[in-house]
Design a protein with these regions (language model features):
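C-terminal and inter-domain tail/linker signature
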Residues: 1-122
């Protein structure tokens, strides 16, 4: 999980870790969106080639140039009409498997197959 709570954490997250650290081929494919009076929940497929460091998702991991495709959920909460916090969730084991850092076949990690299953609902 990543994101931020409060003005300063959100500013830092968006300006330093998140937006400027996306690989150029990043693609977000919407699956579903739920909108409430003070909250937004987005379910999506997040795909990219790991061509640069991504401190928000893979802190300290050098680029592997491998393709990654995962389901991702973002929950955004608003307070008084302003962004209060954003939490982003994904299956880190699937990411690690796809970039080659987790390869034990005995582990119950599905990798890109999870994104393919979620994509069936689109």
């Amino acid at each position: 999980m990543t994101g931020g709570v409060g003005k300063e954490e959100l500013r830092r997250f968006y300006s330093e870790d998140f937006v400027p650290r996306m690989p150029p081929d990043t693609k977000l494919t919407p699956v579903s969106r739920t909108i409430g009076t003070d909250q937004l929940v987005d379910e999506m497929i997040f795909s990219f080639t790991h061509t640069e460091e991504m401190p928000w998702m893979l802190p300290g991991i050098k680029p592997t140039n491998r393709a990654v495709k995962i389901p991702l959920v973002a929950i955004v909460h608003f307070r008084d009409g302003k962004l209060a916090h954003e939490h982003i969730y994904w299956d880190q084991a699937s990411v690690l498997k796809q970039i080659g850092l987790l390869s034990d076949p005995a582990l119950p990690v599905v990798g890109a197959e999870a994104a393919a299953k979620v994509s069936q609902t689109i």
